[in-house]
Amino acid sequence: KINKNSLILYDDRITIKKDLSDYFKELNLNSIKKLIINFDPNLKFKKKHITYDLNYRNQLVYNSNNLKIYNDSKCTNLNNAIYKNNLINSVNKILILGGKFKKQDKNLKYNITNTLVLIFGSQKDLFINQLKFIHSNYFKFNNLNELFKFLKLIIKFNKYEFILFSPGGESYDSYKNYLDRGNHFNQLIKKVLL
């Protein structure tokens, strides 16, 4: 036997849902309104609260009057590495690429202009095949340690303004992760410059 007083009609359930929904929308709007009304325009935010501190993402690791070195070990995409390199407005720059190559469209070639490109790792030829060198040269190395022996010589005898370590490949070929690779790069920079 069904008690008629305990039944909620279908239309009544819809009405109750709508009323609850309207109530929470109004409650939300009132909360936002309070925030806006009470907002202090002189409020200062600490930088770390509004930005992400990603290790080895465009990290300036060396800065002298003549040379800036950036560690962007987090970059695992060739397109991003080339894009960042092209943002540097200088003909005296070095781009360091390497790592485990991510598959790309074989017909797509990235233009690299006015740059000395140093490429390390077992898949260095895959990187070279994706690049179109315009007023640029490249050298290949088996690993980052070999690359740094060469780098030490060329920065001693040539004037470069920028060195960008933006590998454009994954780190798993030789490192535990991009943090491990970025840390290794920073250690090698200290050895070369000191």
Label the model's feature ranges.
Residues 167-194:
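Glycine/aspartate-rich loop-and-adjacent alpha/beta segment that forms the canonical ThDP
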Residues 23, 104-162:
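C-terminal helical cap/extension that packs against the catalytic core
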Residues 1-21, 173-179:
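Flexible active-site lid/hinge loop adjacent to a nucleotide/diphosphate
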Residues 1, 6-8, 95-96, 116-122:
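Short, hydrophobic beta-strand segments that form beta-sheet elements in well-ordered domains
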Residues 77, 143-146, 177:
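Alpha-helix N-cap recognition
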Residues 81-84, 127-131, 185:
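Hydrophobic packing residues within well-ordered alpha-helices of enzyme cores
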Residues 76, 99-102, 123, 164-172:
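Short glycine-rich anion-binding loops that position phosphate/pyrophosphate groups of nucleotides
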Residues 13-115:
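Nucleotide phosphate-binding/pyrophosphate-handling subdomain across enzymes
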